Regions:
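Non-catalytic propeptide/linker segments at domain boundaries
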Residues: 3-105
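Extracytoplasmic
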Residues: 99-101, 165-168, 195-199, 255
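Short glycine-rich His-centered loop
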Residues: 102-114
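Solvent-exposed loop/turn segments at secondary-structure junctions
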Residues: 111-112, 140-144, 175-180, 207-210, ...
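Catalytic-core regions of hydrolytic enzymes
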Residues: 115-122, 126-189
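A short, glycine/acidic-enriched catalytic loop
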Residues: 178-213
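Active-site-adjacent substrate-binding region
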Residues: 216-243
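Active-site-adjacent mobile loop/cap segments within catalytic or ligand-binding domains
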Residues: 240-271
Length: 271
């Protein structure tokens, strides 16, 4: 048996941090420097212990709503019919390709390990190469502790939105933490173009009317569904079902705010 350690539900954001970074903190050197860990390109995290590779399939049953070749796991009181109708609607924004103004912000509320910063940097570099003006923030939001990390990252995102009102999408890039009851780590994996690859899971929050205030959750859900349809359609097995739940994660700040779990704490960086 295994236990998936989902992040704890977030309540209303805490007070903003007293000191907000004024500039993007860039990694030094070439991205290739970060794609080969010191222990070797296929090395697992040094503290990983026993690793169990596992492919997480798309779901079926009353809790799952089909989304193209993918699916959405509904952990809310919203009906399946309501969700299915909502994700059929168009996106509430349009990305302006080749715009001189930033369209996307990639950031990390927690887990600013060198691996996840490298992953976020590849995401940003790939979008920029495709003509989508993207910024990457590497602020250490969970230092000195996890407590307050989302308040800190909220202040950072608000600063970017004030400086660059053209930003339509905010991607909070993380890795998941999945462990068995015995403490072994699971590595969510699939095969893409012949290479073992970390699976991806999108988390989209929902307003619960009290502690989780997300008036724009429907628009964010449409965006999550568009990602799921595209990714799973292009690369079958690449995604885990979208997790639609009462989570906050500062997703009230735009209509394109999502948390992206890229692999887990058992995956290696190449995956």
């Amino acid at each position: 048996a295994s236990v998936q350690a989902d992040p704890a539900p977030e309540s209303a954001p805490e007070a903003a941090a007293s000191s907000v970074p004024q500039t993007v903190q860039a990694l030094t050197g070439s991205i290739e420097d970060y794609l080969v860990p010191l222990l070797g390109e296929d090395a697992r995290p040094a503290d990983a212990g026993s690793i169990l590779e596992k492919n997480y399939p798309q779901g079926s049953g009353e809790k799952y709503i089909p989304c193209g070749a993918g699916s959405i796991k509904n952990n809310t009181r919203q009906t399946a019919a309501d969700i299915a109708a909502e994700i059929a609607n168009p996106l509430p924004f349009a990305i302006d390709p080749n715009s001189p103004d930033p369209q996307v912000l990639v950031m990390h509320s927690t887990d600013r390990s060198i691996n996840m910063c490298a992953v976020g940097r590849v995401v940003a570099d790939t979008l920029n190469a495709a003509g989508i003006n993207t910024l990457h923030d590497e602020t250490l939001n969970d230092y000195p502790s996890y407590t307050g990390s989302y308040a800190n990252s909220r202040a950072v995102v608000q600063q970017y939105l004030a400086q660059y009102p053209s930003i339509k999408v905010v991607l909070d890039v993380h890795r998941d933490a999945i462990e068995s009851e015995s403490g072994s780590r699971y590595a969510p994996v699939c095969t893409v173009e012949g290479r073992q690859t970390a699976q991806v899971m999108i988390i989209c929050g929902c307003d619960n009317g009290t502690t989780v205030q997300l008036p724009n959750w429907r628009q964010n859900l449409r965006f999550a569904a568009a990602w799921e349809r595209s990714m799973e359609g292009m690369y079958p097995g690449f995604t885990r079902p979208v997790l639609f739940s009462y989570r906050f994660y500062n997703q009230d700040l735009t209509t394109g705010s999502l948390l992206i779990e890229i692999g887990g704490h058992g995956n290696n960086l190449n995956e």
